[in-house]
């Protein structure tokens, strides 16, 4: 699927203009006063993962995501229902999203360091339901009640920690009348996690490799042991190299210095697309004496349309399990990674990833 760059840029520009238009049209005092998403429709009572019982339309055709995780998950199972996005897609992402979504307005997100949810713009788009998806926070029930009270729109939470994710896809399949595809996605997730658990259990503790997961331009922001952003490392049977530091579940992670990194001296280094890979590849002296660099065990994490490991940590981690397992333990996780990527992209994005596209994604992400 090759679409012109000009077309993509125009689509993104249109989305920005539409978002601004909706922002100002929604700034009035009565932005949602005349909108009742339950008026004249059949409803059901849905119990969300906060334990809240919420009346929602029986047939859902218009949804607003509360943030980046919700956007990612909904984009895989019901993109046609989206009336807006938490953030506009980049030009690199557009090929993997339905063209309809390219010009949707943006609402921002409710949680996280970039929390900026624009209630007025969201209400102006008139969704039937606001869906929040992700890990459960201490104040989640109160937060969902607050959004629902402020917008007048039914708001539900669906939990997607890795063990809850299959159930989340089954729930979404039910809500959107897409039980068959929801079950396929749920089963794929279960099979992936089970495969990794079985192989991880076969690796002796003494043989477990340590992995450093660096983010950002310096490579010294990292996802430490215990962070949800780095849980794929543990799932495949490896160890997070960064221990004994503060842990952050935010995308920026934990900042370390080069002295600490040399003390950790990981067996494998993986960095995000915006990271330090090219600097390491060009022989930057501050990195050259690390064992992983001397042995050629440093890699770039594929990141289109989303980082395969986290950022945000969602269903993208499922592909990350296949990739990181194959990279760190190729004898145990023995399969064709190009074929695995194609399988995932077809199921979750309905996208026919070509051999050349997959190989390009993996160019800096395969065993040297």
Task: Describe the residue ranges of each PLM region.
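A short, structured surface patch at a secondary-structure boundary
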Residues: 70-125, 129-137, 241
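Structural recognition of the beta-strand scaffold that forms the well-ordered cores
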Residues: 62-66, 83-86, 129-133, 154-159, ...
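Alpha-helical, coiled-coil/dimerization segments enriched in small aliphatic residues
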Residues: 111, 222-252
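Extracytoplasmic strand-loop-helix segments at the start of, or within, the mature domains
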Residues: 39, 44-49, 57-92
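Short, low-complexity disordered leader/linker segments with a strong preference
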Residues: 1-59
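A contiguous binding-surface segment within folded domains or other stable secondary-structure elements
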Residues: 125, 243, 247-300
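Short helix-initiation/N-cap motifs at beta->coil->alpha
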Residues: 49-51, 105-120, 246-258
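Extracytoplasmic substrate-binding proteins
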Residues: 38, 53, 142-221, 250, ...
């Amino acid at each position: 699927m090759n679409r012109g760059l000009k077309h993509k840029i125009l689509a993104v520009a249109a989305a920005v203009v539409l978002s601004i238009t909706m922002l100002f049209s929604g700034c009035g005092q009565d932005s949602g006063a005349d909108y009742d998403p339950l008026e004249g429709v059949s409803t059901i009572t849905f119990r969300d993962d906060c334990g809240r019982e919420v009346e929602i339309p029986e047939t859902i055709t218009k949804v607003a995501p509360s943030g980046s995780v919700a956007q990612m998950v909904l984009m895989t199972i019901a993109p046609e229902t989206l009336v807006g996005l938490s953030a506009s897609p980049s030009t690199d992402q557009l090929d993997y999203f339905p063209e309809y979504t390219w010009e949707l307005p943006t609402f921002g997100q409710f949680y996280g360091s970039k929390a900026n949810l624009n209630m007025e713009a969201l209400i102006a788009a008139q969704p039937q339901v606001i869906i929040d998806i992700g890990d459960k926070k201490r104040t989640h029930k109160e937060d969902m009640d607050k959004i629902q009270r402020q917008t007048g729109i039914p708001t539900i939470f669906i939990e997607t920690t890795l063990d809850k994710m299959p159930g989340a896809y089954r729930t979404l399949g039910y809500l959107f009348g897409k039980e068959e595809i929801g079950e396929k996605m749920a089963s794929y997730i279960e099979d992936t996690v089970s495969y990794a658990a079985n192989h991880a259990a076969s690796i002796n503790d003494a043989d477990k490799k340590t992995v450093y997961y660096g983010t950002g331009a310096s490579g010294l922001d990292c996802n430490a042991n215990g962070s949800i952003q780095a849980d794929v490392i543990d799932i495949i049977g490896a160890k997070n190299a960064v221990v004994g530091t503060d842990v952050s579940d935010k995308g920026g992670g934990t900042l370390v210095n080069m002295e600490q990194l040399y003390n950790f001296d990981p067996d494998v280094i993986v960095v995000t697309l915006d990271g330090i890979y090219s600097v390491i590849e060009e022989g930057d002296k501050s990195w050259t004496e690390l064992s992983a660099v001397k042995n050629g065990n440093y890699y770039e994490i594929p990141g289109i349309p989303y980082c395969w490991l986290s950022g945000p940590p969602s269903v993208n981690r499922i592909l990350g399990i296949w990739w990181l397992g194959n990279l760190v333990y190729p004898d145990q996780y023995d399969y064709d990674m190009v074929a695995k990527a194609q399988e995932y992209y077809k199921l979750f994005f309905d996208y026919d990833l070509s051999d050349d596209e997959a190989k390009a994604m993996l160019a800096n992400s395969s065993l040297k």
